[in-house]
Amino acid sequence: MKIRIGHGFDVHKFGEARPLILCGVEVPYETGLVAHSDGDVVLHAISDAILGAMALGDIGKHFPDTDAAYKGADSRVLLRHCYALARAKGFELGNLDVTIIAQAPKMAPHIEDMRQVLAADLNADIADINVKATTTEKLGFTGRKEGIAVEAVVLLSRQ
């Protein structure tokens, strides 16, 4: 069995007059995230983790923000594309662990919906998908409610 581990990290600042979308789930909040795509910072970190595990670069390489084709892009489509690249090489998801770092909004009411979306998009058992949230105790840009940061770790395996 061959195993690969990938780590992804992404940050977006608040400021767009659009819905806040995290893991493909609309989270009620006063503002959305600034981004070329739909701004789903969680799916961007997960996509980077998958691409990293496969040594395929990052989402900026695959979906450049200089390409108008990706303006407002649905990050779920981007995630599924990244996972399809791994599957094409015979790899399947072992597990996914995500940490959302944000002072606001509160994530707890939305975590299970996020896990369901991820399990569906990655064709995985929900038991293999973990999403958790934390704050920085009001320190730094996330603590000042200026944006959201996300870390994602993925394990992929091939029999």
Swiss-Prot record:
Catalysed reaction, written as an equation: 4-CDP-2-C-methyl-D-erythritol 2-phosphate = 2-C-methyl-D-erythritol 2,4-cyclic diphosphate + CMP
Q: Identify the metabolic or biological route this protein is part of.
A: Isoprenoid biosynthesis; isopentenyl diphosphate biosynthesis via DXP pathway; isopentenyl diphosphate from 1-deoxy-D-xylulose 5-phosphate: step 4/6
Q: Which domain of life is it from?
A: Bacteria
Binding-site list for 4-CDP-2-C-methyl-D-erythritol 2-phosphate: 10-12, 36-37, 58-60, 63-67, 102-108, 134-137, 141, 144
Q: Which Pfam families match?
A: YgbB (PF02542)
- Which GO molecular-function terms appear in the entry? 2-C-methyl-D-erythritol 2,4-cyclodiphosphate synthase activity; metal ion binding
| Entry-linked InterPro entries | MECDP_synthase, MECDP_synthase_CS, MECDP_synthase_sf
Record-listed a divalent metal cation binding positions:
10, 12, 44
Q: Name one GO biological process term.
A: isopentenyl diphosphate biosynthetic process, methylerythritol 4-phosphate pathway
Which cofactors go with this protein? a divalent metal cation
Query: Recorded E.C. number(s)?
Result: 4.6.1.12
In this UniProt entry, which residues are annotated as the site Transition state stabilizer? 36, 135
Q: What's the record's note on cofactor binding?
A: Binds 1 divalent metal cation per subunit.
Q: Which UniProt keywords apply?
A: Isoprene biosynthesis, Lyase, Metal-binding
Instruction: Decide whether keyword Lyase is in the record.
Output: yes
- Which residue windows are transmembrane per the record? none
The family note in this entry says: Belongs to the IspF family.
What this chain does, per the entry, is described as: Involved in the biosynthesis of isopentenyl diphosphate (IPP) and dimethylallyl diphosphate (DMAPP), two major building blocks of isoprenoid compounds. Catalyzes the conversion of 4-diphosphocytidyl-2-C-methyl-D-erythritol 2-phosphate (CDP-ME2P) to 2-C-methyl-D-erythritol 2,4-cyclodiphosphate (ME-CPP) with a corresponding release of cytidine 5-monophosphate (CMP).
Q: Which PANTHER family match?
A: 2-C-METHYL-D-ERYTHRITOL 2,4-CYCLODIPHOSPHATE SYNTHASE, CHLOROPLASTIC (PTHR43181:SF1)
HAMAP family from the xrefs?
A: IspF
Matching entries from NCBIfam families are given as: ispF (TIGR00151)
Question: Subunit comment for this entry?
Answer: Homotrimer.
What is the recorded name of this protein?
2-C-methyl-D-erythritol 2,4-cyclodiphosphate synthase
State the organism of origin. Answer: Shewanella sp. (strain ANA-3)
Lineage, broadest ranks: Bacteria, Pseudomonadati, Pseudomonadota, Gammaproteobacteria, Alteromonadales
